[in-house]
Curated annotation (Swiss-Prot):
Chief place where the protein resides: other
GO cellular component: peroxisome
List of residues binding substrate: R360
Modified sites of kind N6-(pyridoxal phosphate)lysine: K209
Gene Ontology molecular function, alphabetical: alanine-glyoxylate transaminase activity; L-serine-pyruvate transaminase activity; protein homodimerization activity
Gene3D superfamilies linked: Aspartate Aminotransferase, domain 1 (3.90.1150.10), Type I PLP-dependent aspartate aminotransferase-like (Major domain) (3.40.640.10)
Self-association and partners: Homodimer.
Species for this entry: Oryctolagus cuniculus
N6-acetyllysine found at: K225, K234, K312
UniProt-listed Enzyme Commission number(s): 2.6.1.44, 2.6.1.51
Listed cofactors: pyridoxal 5'-phosphate
Similarity remark: Belongs to the class-V pyridoxal-phosphate-dependent aminotransferase family.
Listed name of the protein: Alanine--glyoxylate aminotransferase
Alphabetized UniProt keyword annotations: Acetylation, Aminotransferase, Peroxisome, Pyridoxal phosphate, Transferase
């Protein structure tokens, strides 16, 4: 056998310990981790199929049911970010040829439409300008025209800062034999949502926003109507990894002995459990109130600086992610860079249809405090003094 030699030397960078900066993350996510969640990341590993792990998973299911306000048995966490939860929903609910109605008033509706197209669904996007929302009348007209099996709406559109009203949409969809799928990645814990009472058939969210857990896990729940559609599929879902019937088993949702499907992110699940425990300790209503009050404080401080909010109707503003019109004679990148380099605070620019139009400020979970707002206002005041472009 021919001898072999190493062609790649040990990287010098990996001889040094990892060192990361301490920053205040006031962008649209991820968010800073509270001490209890941070400590969960340092717990010792256990097996992903140990009884103790199943107990943690069962507690997470209860936490999701509380956060979503649902009694759905088919409730679980997905091993992946919010995008993974979106694809889990669509891969299991849609089959080729199904009509899919999509609220596309920001990047998340655009993404949902693209995934639907990849599945082979007949996608009907309801395209609206960024900053807009959907009314019951608008949606009913499209339901009557296209007769979809599924409607997608984004509750908290973090690319535009819009909070989509949800009351009445579940009942409307069911009247037209359509299921309602809602993205609450940016809104969960920060704005009221009632899955069962609002007739939402599939609701998903992410770990790294107002829940203040690391990215990498997402939350999802299915109504009995949605479960029936999934279990009556004529074709297998495109993804084995995201097959809900298989995920239901490892999460103890089907009443059968749990079997191996994939290796779940044990430490990430520990962190998610602790983040949900913190939400339970605080209480949903207090969390919603705190986000609302701190967002109002942010609006006042921004207006004192002469900045304009992108979403004009206060009732439609997402309290967790605020969009601010980039002022004339400024480049958004300059403001973002100045605030980061001089104050160690992250904010971001727009995304998708709001790119180059807005700055985005996140007040997520433990980061939603008046003190953080005041600290950011100081940073923005200085940035506006130093970043103006010449009008010549």
């Amino acid at each position: 056998m021919a001898s072999r030699q190493l062609l790649v030397a040990p990287p010098e960078a990996l001889r040094k310990p990892l060192c990361t900066p301490h920053r205040l993350l006031l962008g649209p996510g991820p968010s800073n981790l509270p001490p209890r969640v941070l400590a969960a990341g340092g717990l010792q590993m256990i097996g992903h199929m140990h009884e103790e792990m199943y107990q943690v998973m069962d507690e997470i299911k209860q936490g999701i049911q509380y956060a979503f306000q649902t009694r759905n048995a088919l409730t679980l966490a997905v091993s992946g970010s919010g995008h993974c939860a979106l694809e889990t929903a669509l891969f299991n609910l849609l089959e080729p040829g199904d009509a899919f109605l999509v609220g596309a008033n920001g990047i998340w509706g655009q993404r949902a439409a693209e995934v639907g197209e990849r599945i082979g669904a007949r996608v009907h996007p309801m395209i609206k300008d960024p900053g807009s929302h959907y009314t019951l009348q608008e949606v009913e007209e499209c339901l009557a025209q296209h007769k979809p099996v599924l409607l997608f709406l984004t509750h908290g559109e973090s690319s535009t800062g819009v909070l989509q009203p949800l009351d009445g949409f579940g009942e409307l969809c069911h009247r037209y034999k359509c299921l309602l799928l809602v993205d609450s990645v940016a809104s969960l814990g920060g704005a009221p949502i009632y899955m069962d009472q609002q007739g939402i058939d599939v609701l998903y969210s992410g770990s790294q926003k107002a829940l203040n857990a690391p990215p990498g896990t997402s939350l999802i729940s299915f109504s009995d109507k949605a479960k029936s559609k999934i279990y009556a599929r004529k074709t297998k879902p495109f993804s084995f990894y995201m097959d809900v019937q298989l995920l239901a088993n490892i999460w103890g949702c089907d009443g059968k002995p749990r079997m191996y499907h994939h290796t779940t992110p044990v430490i990430g699940i520990f962190a998610l459990r602790e983040s949900l425990a913190l939400l339970v300790e605080q209480g949903l209503e207090k969390s919603w109130q705190r986000h609302r009050e701190v967002a109002q404080h942010l609006y006042r401080r921004l207006q004192e600086l002469g900045l304009q909010l992108f979403v004009k109707d206060p009732a439609l503003r997402l309290p967790t992610v605020t969009t601010v019109i980039v002022p004339a004679s400024y480049r958004w990148r300059d403001i973002v860079s100045y605030v980061m380099h001089h104050f160690g605070i992250e904010i971001t620019g727009g995304l998708g249809p709001s790119a180059d139009k807005v700055l985005r400020i996140g007040l997520l979970g433990c980061n939603a405090t008046r003190e953080n707002v005041d600290r950011l206002a100081t940073a923005l005041r200085e940035a506006l003094q130093h970043c103006a472009q010449s009008q010549l």
